[in-house]
Amino acid sequence: MNTLPNYEIYCVKYGERPGRRPEHFVGGDPHDESMPMDYFVWLVRNAERTVLVDTGYTAKMAIRGRVLLRTPAEGLALIGTRASEIRDVIITHLHNDHVGTFYDFPNARFHLQDKEMEYVTGRHMLHNIFRRPYEIDEVTAMIRKVYENRVVFYNGEGEVAPGISVHHIGGHTMGLQSVRVHTARGWVVLASDASHYYEHFEKNRCFPLVYHLGDMLEGFAALRRLADSEQHIVPGHDPLVLQRYPAASAELRGIVARLDLPPVALFIEAVVCQPVPAR
């Protein structure tokens, strides 16, 4: 019997921006409270293989109210991985905060959904509401990668490597994909923008930048099917991720978290909330 390999998963924060609750939900939110957004890339690795999920935004894009704390390549260096070593990059979608520094990975192939390439080169880009989060230079650069035989396309779901698979979700964009990774604690799903925050999939609420609202809602159910539990679903932009999961090291607390390890905060909450036995 073939045993699937286990991987470590590192969530690397490279940027952030302030925000308010009403801007993160369709229909707004009655509580006008602070709700900042973090920006991550994710490194999946074991002794045999290293795969990067997304490449973040560029310094040019940071001027749009965002803060660039470090480039994704600099973030990876903090955990001992050089950008030049990476051979496979999964692009969950082509928004500018997920594909921006692709050029820092000169030896990589890029794994992308057919529908995302169809979306960014087709009629929907005639509408500013869909076009706005994309950068034409990044889209055309990915087309060039196709002509260089450096793009691997998927139609729905597919295996990138044993224990690592991509799954078309849609909703946020036509071709959004999430990533399923086998770890020592089970199947972890990197939702990316299928769920920006925990609150989106936990309460079936939608982020307002959306291609298809129905697909986004159905996507929450897909995430649950793919993951071993809701505690195995990792949202794409929630600052709580770095609080709920153990840091890669004491020095990297608040910068890099280990998603292949059990969520510390949830464990603590569960212990604290246990009923006190009667005496």
Model-derived segments and spans:
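Zn-dependent metallo-beta-lactamase
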Residues: 1-51, 57-59, 222, 247, ...
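Short glycine-enriched, charge-decorated loop/helix-capping segments at active-site entrances
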Residues: 26-30, 60-62, 66, 126-129, ...
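Metallo-beta-lactamase
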Residues: 70, 75-81, 85, 115-168, ...
